[in-house]
Amino acid sequence: MFGGQQPILVLSQNTKRESGRKVQLENIQAGKAIADVIRTCLGPQAMLKMLMDPMGGIVMTNDGNAILREITVQHPAAKSMIEIARTQDEEVGDGTTSVIVLAGEMLAAAEPFLQQQIHPTVIIRAYREALEDIVGHLQSQLSIQLDVKDKAKMADVVKACVGTKFIGKWSDLAVKIALDAVETVTLSENGRLEVDIKRYAKVEKIPGGAIEESCVLKGVMINKDVTHPKMRRLIENPRIVLLDCSLEYKKGESQTNVEIIGEQDFTRMLQIEEEFVQRICADIIAVKPDLVFTEKGVSDLAQHYLLKAGITAIRRLRKTDNLRIARACGATIVNRTEELTEKDVGTGAGLFEVKKIGDEYFTFVTECKEPKACTILLRGASKDILNETERNLQDALHVARNLVLEPRLVAGGGAVEMAASQLLTRKQVKGPYTAVAHALEIIPRTLAQNCGANTIRALTALRAKHASHTGDGVCAWGIDGESGEIVDMNVKNIWEPLAVKLQTYKTAVETAILLLRIDDIVSGSKKRGGNEPTNPAAMAQGQE
């Protein structure tokens, strides 16, 4: 009866649907392709990638997240791989390259099982179990406690992070900057620890000079000049007032019409405006400040009154800069000048000065007594160098912050991966569980590859070291990223924060699980151009 009927089309005709094993294997290929792009960026001998954006700008970096941000990919699985690098960067600030390499290897480890027609949920169950065991081992057996007061140990950990970057040549300077900045912005109150480096540790880049001139200012630096040329540009122990309102005549919120009949009406209007500005300036002068910062404008008349009172004014600050100055000098940001009181005035700053660096004027509020905000001043030969230095420094700042918030360490140089791999292997569970153990070895293997060592020999020797370890302590044998030799990380002093490693493993395994769960891709609801690949397999080739 229904034999001659047309098949029912549910999907649009220009929509392509792929499902089953083919999709899972394509997802794995896409993940591996992204991991291969990033692999050479791991370790102290990492190569740089030069990327050109659509606007013609050039980015040179070995930061996993920065590279993937610039690459344009089409395959949906590749896009989710890029997303995990961003998550890693936001959460812990370091380990972006490791997480991509590890996620790619976790996917590759699942490929043979899929080809043997093992169901993805079986693989996923084994991966989950392996992840739980890894996290348990890391927290109990493979990590050591760090004393935050031990500055030398803290410096070693940050140095290990910085050593793999472009800034590694100036590692001592970078470590000092990172630790100083984090120590400055650390706020401990009511048993709560807060380290907000994003808001209160601002990085200011000024082209010119040498990288060695970079430093941490115990205060705030902003790219502004005084509003009037005759105002003071150097004040010691200034009294600072911070405003969130304009020092100009305030116009009404709604539209108003004024009818002027005679000349005296016009004169009266001007007089009212003048009196208003005079009143707000009188409110400010009453608390005897030396310095006024406002986020809005300052009229010429207000400048005149403030100059007569010997007060320096700086206008149009960013909200974030105003908050930093408030934290640094102890002032309170005031919204209405009538409400200004003595306790709103900041007296914590030791020096205010305006300096000319290059062609621009910069305002410095420094030598603060108890600054809970700071500015990192970076100098360098070119914009590209400054941008890469800033990216590297952000990683160092995040590592220092992680140590303050969670002071536990694991051995670097692939030692912790090999130790975790051995612990999983000893459990003697067949199948995908063991595949996770082998996948972890990609980190020491890549470190050996990137410095030109004999990978097979190095890995076999490292495996033997870990297999023969029977003591209670952490087995800290790993690959020296500089030479490719096997060294004890206790001696070499290469440690990494536990928080970074935990996040790396969780993200990598969860991503592999997510991509293995996909068995259907419906793509292409809009018409494509003739030169674009239409199937996801072809898309995966487009990212390199």
Curated annotation (Swiss-Prot):
UniProt-listed CDD domains: TCP1_gamma
S-S pairs: 368-374
A matching Pfam family: Cpn60_TCP1
SUPFAM superfamilies linked: GroEL apical domain-like (SSF52029), GroEL equatorial domain-like (SSF48592), GroEL-intermediate domain like (SSF54849)
GO cellular component, as recorded: chaperonin-containing T-complex
Subunit annotation: Heterooligomeric complex of about 850 to 900 kDa that forms two stacked rings, 12 to 16 nm in diameter.
Name of this protein: T-complex protein 1 subunit gamma
